């Protein structure tokens, strides 16, 4: 069982694999699991290969469109809160202990504050990546964008970028 799933179970959350599409969407979200908590849905996503905004196959607009579609479907189905926790890693198996701990802290905050609306939490993303979403926050209907960096973030960015150059 993946370490992120273990963290979700610590909070008593029921989780669902995202190896399938969410509700009536025709594509599956990135990552590991989604969690339904009362009238909220939490998407815990592992962005394999780091979603480097300088990489030619990645566009921030695509990411925003996908997340907004997930949010719209959830809200249409009666959810009052949609939260994304996005973890930047090389591969699913490379989520590091510090990142798992950061996800645990974000989940604890969500669990205690029960936020309403649309929130995005980035774990170990470059500032320029997060800035794209922050700058479009109002237009996208996002209530908050938060970023968290673990202590090994800079080293991990170098490693991911080196693997992209191969």
Question: Model-predicted segments: where are they?
Answer:
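Nucleic-acid endo/exonuclease domains
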Residues: 1-166
């Amino acid at each position: 069982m993946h370490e992120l799933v273990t963290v979700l179970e610590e909070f008593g959350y029921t989780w669902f694999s995202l190896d399938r599409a969410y509700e009536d969407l025709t594509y599956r979200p990135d990552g590991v699991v989604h969690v339904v908590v009362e009238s909220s849905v939490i998407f815990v996503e592992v962005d394999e290969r780091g979603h480097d905004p300088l990489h030619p196959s990645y566009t921030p607009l695509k990411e925003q469109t996908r997340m907004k579609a997930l949010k719209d479907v959830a809200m249409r189905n009666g959810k009052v809160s949609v939260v994304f926790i996005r973890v930047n890693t090389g591969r699913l198996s490379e989520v590091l202990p510090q990142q798992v701990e950061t996800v645990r802290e974000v989940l604890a905050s969500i669990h205690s504050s029960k936020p309403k609306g649309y929130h995005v939490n980035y774990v170990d993303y470059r500032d320029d990546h997060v800035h794209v979403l922050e700058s479009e926050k109002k237009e996208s209907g996002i209530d908050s964008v938060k970023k968290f960096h673990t202590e090994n973030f800079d080293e991990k960015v170098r490693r991911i970028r080196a693997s992209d150059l191969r």
